[in-house]
Amino acid sequence: MITLTERQSLILKAIVRDYTEGGNPVGSKSLVQELPIKVSSATIRNEMARLEDLGLIVKTHLSSGRIPSIKGYRYYVDHILKPEKVDGKDLKVIQHSLGGEFHKIDEIVAQSADILSQLTSYTTFTLRPELKDSRLSGFRLVPLGNHQVMAILVTNNGDVENQTFTIPSDITGDELEPVVRFIDDQLVGLPLQDVLRQLTHEIPLKLAQYLQDPDGFLDIFGSVLSKAASERFYVGGKLNLFNYTDQQSPKELQSLYSLLDQTDRLANVIGPPGQRIQVRIGNEITNDLLKNYSLITATYDVDQHGQGVIALLGPTAMPYSRMIGLMGAFQRELARKLLDYYRYFDE
């Protein structure tokens, strides 16, 4: 385990700060003016050599200065960093943007990704709270003509999912009415995950009492139910990611952009809700496409309604102190807004 002296920590902190703010390698002469302690340029050079031996900073080919390594960023985040207090203007932007009127949780969560992206200029992700508390509160089939129906599913927290389907020509509206009544009588009030589990066995057996071949209806009901129960990732600032891709080939860039549209792969990258703000740097992210990036994730808690995740993806040379402070403030404001929303439905 690496242990730095106070002076070495101050030098590493200054190198990280200068490089993330200016993007240029940092030399000993500039550090002489910046450090809060009086020390000679020669002493700083010696300490920088020690930091380089430890693998915390590296020399570039274009300059005599040094830049932080992935290992250096990791040490800085774990042992030196103190989150900045969020700027008052940024806090007002968050509160104002989340202070509007929203009709669905997804609208709040989607808006959050856009707000966070605008504040950071990075690519951001928001995952809505877990759906363990979501229950089925209603289901309807609306005939549209030409053997088409719209399936509408409503949950207890106000979410509405709808999809249009073509039903087999041998199934009539009269045959579907008792099926919808069965769902209202037997399934309304159950958690969505319980209803999904019953789709594999119990529900098909019971629907066979009403339909000769229930498969067509099961496809309809299962599709809209799965959509309502699925994880929802929202992405803000997709194009921001390409501001930090100098070392990647066109093929890698295409794969990277494609990744942002794949919920399952995003879920693996971002991970489940945790206990605190987490920072993963370079190879710590479970996807080779993101080896030159850093990912900051924060879990927000909405009491019995579960937990969600906010995340931002940017270059390894990001201002971690400001970003972590901002994520903490955003985490609190989003949780407060969602608690207000849930309180309305709980009443």
Swiss-Prot record:
Alphabetical list of Pfam families matching this protein: HrcA, HrcA_DNA-bdg
GO MF term set: DNA binding
InterPro entries recorded: GAF-like_dom_sf, HrcA, HrcA_C, WH-like_DNA-bd_sf, WH_DNA-bd_sf, WHTH_HrcA_DNA-bd, WHTH_transcript_rep_HrcA_IDD
Keywords: Repressor, Stress response, Transcription, Transcription regulation
Single GO BP term: negative regulation of DNA-templated transcription
Database matches in HAMAP family: HrcA
Purpose of the protein: Negative regulator of class I heat shock genes (grpE-dnaK-dnaJ and groELS operons). Prevents heat-shock induction of these operons.
Entry similarity comment: Belongs to the HrcA family.
NCBIfam families cross-referenced by the UniProt entry: hrcA
Listed PANTHER family: HEAT-INDUCIBLE TRANSCRIPTION REPRESSOR HRCA (PTHR34824:SF1)
Protein name as catalogued: Heat-inducible transcription repressor HrcA
Source lineage: Bacteria, Bacillati, Bacillota, Bacilli, Lactobacillales
Gene that encodes the chain: hrcA
